[in-house]
Amino acid sequence: TKKDGEEKVA
């Protein structure tokens, strides 16, 4: 998901 312009992958 994208949070604060940061892409995180589970």
Swiss-Prot record:
Keyword presence, Mitochondrion: no
| GO MF annotation list | serine-type endopeptidase inhibitor activity
Q: Which UniProt keywords apply?
A: Protease inhibitor, Serine protease inhibitor
Describe its function: Strongly inhibits trypsin and plasma enzyme(s) activity.
Family of the protein in this entry: Belongs to the serpin family.
Under the subunit heading, UniProt states: Monomer.
Name recorded for this polypeptide: Serine proteinase inhibitor
Q: Which organism is it from?
A: Halocynthia roretzi
